[in-house]
C-alpha cells in the first residue's frame, strides 16, 4: 500500500523507520532530484555518524553564486529573478565545494556540472567513470535501499510521471532484481511545476512506496540560462547542418554549439535561400565537400527528422515548432519493417500517424521557456514525444535492436568536445592531470552507435582555439594526456573552419584533414610535429589554408548575416533583458582585457582617461548610475569603457 504524506519531516522519519543502518540512496541526474527531500535527509544525518549516507547520482544542479565586483552586480539580480529566491540549493553540493562533507557522507557522481567541481577533492575522489548506459548496473551493485525522484501528477488523473527523468530508475530496479537484491524503497516528490509526459514515463502511484506532496507552490525548476551564440558557434553549427540527411535521425547535445546547429537546421528548412547565401559566404566550396555529398544535403526537409537523444533541450523545441522534427516511428517491428520495405499500406500509414512518436529522450533540461512549452503542448503533439529508458535511447543492445535499427535510419550524432588530436582522438570530459570536468555521459555510446548503424555518422564539434590574442592556444592538438573517445573510433570533426572526415582514413590523411580545420596560426607547428612523428610523407601545398582559417576572415564572412538578423545573438530566445544583453559582451570583454597585472593596469588607465559617459540603462541596472564610493566610481568608469569598446565591435 502506497503511503501519502505532505510533510518533509514526516517523510524523513518514515524513511528512517524503515531503513536500519546506512542509507544507500539513488537519485536521478538533473532536475529529477527532489531537492527539498534530499536536503531534509542530509540535514537529519549530517551530524549523526551512526547514520552513514551514500548518495549515487549525477549532475547535481545549483544556481551559481554571484561572485564579487561587477560580476556580482550583474549576477545577483539575475540569479534572483531567474531561479527564484526560494530555490532549494542542494546542501551536499555546497558542502562538497568546500570539501566539507562529513566522513560518514559520500556522494558518488558519474557526471558533474561542467567545470563546477574541479577544485573539490571530495567530488573528484568519489567521481565514478561510467557510460550513461552503465550507471544503472553500477548503482545496483551498491545495493541501494532508497531511490528518490521528483514526479509530475497527471492532470485530472491519478497516475504519476517520471517526466524529466525516465532514464535509469526502471533500469536500476531491473538491475537490482537481476542481482537477487531486495527492491529499494521508492519515494516520489510531486512537483506541480514539472510537465506531465505520458507514455512509458507514466506509472501508477503504487509504483512508489511513498508519495510526498508538499502543499503550496513549488519552487521553480532549475532553468538553464540561454547563452549568446557567437560567430564561431554559428560557423560550426552551419557546417554541421549540411551533414543531416532528410528523413534521418537526429541526436544533439547541449550548449551554444547545439543551439547554433538547431538554428541552422531551422534556417535550412524555413528560409533555404538565406541558408544557402550564408553557406556560400562561409565556404563557397561547401556544397561539393565529399562528406556533404555522401552524408548530408542542403535542401529543406520534405520528410522531416526523427529526434532520438538522451537529452531533450531548447533546440528540440525549435526543431519541433518549425516542422524539422516530424518523422514518426512506431514500436511495432512489423510496421517499421513494412515502411522500410515500401510495402506499408494505408492502414499502416494511419496507425503511424495516430500512434507514432517523432521525438524520444531519456531526460530533459532547459530554460523556463522550454518547461512552459512542454506544459502547454497540445495533447496530440505531447503524445508524439516519448521519454524512454537510457538503455533504449543510448544503445542498440537493450533487447529491441532490430526495431531500433529500422527507426534510427541515417542517424547523425552531434556532440561537443574540448579538444581533438590530429590523429582523431577526442578530449571531452577531463583534464590530463586526472581531474574530471564533467563526464563521458552518453558520448561514447553515440560514437559507437554511429559505427554500428548503416549510413550513420558521429560528428564531434569543437572550437578551433581557446582564449584569444597572445594567450590563444589550439584545440586541435598533436596529443593530450586524457582521452574520451579513442582514435580508432574517429569519424567526423567540425571546427569553425570546416569539416574533417576521418572515418577509415590513414593517419597521414587524418593529419591533413585536421590541419585543414585548424586555426592558421597553429597549422605549421601541427604539421611539423606530425613530420617529426613520422606521420607525414610529402605534404601538398593546399594542405595549409592559412588565409581562410582566421578569426578575422570568419567574422567578416558572417558579419552581414549577424547584422540583418539571419544569425541572431539569441536564436532560441533569451532569459536576459535587452539591457543585460548589452552588458554581457562588455563584461566578457572587460574580463579578457584585465587578465594579468599589466593588462589590468593598462585597461584601468584607459578607462579612467576615457570621456565616455556610458549607457545610462546599463549603469542603472548595475547600480552604478550614482556611484557612492571611490570603488564604485572606478567600476562605473571600467564598465562605461567596456560598453564603449563592445559597442564599436
What name fits each language-model region?
Residues 1-649:
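Conserved alpha/beta enzyme-core scaffold
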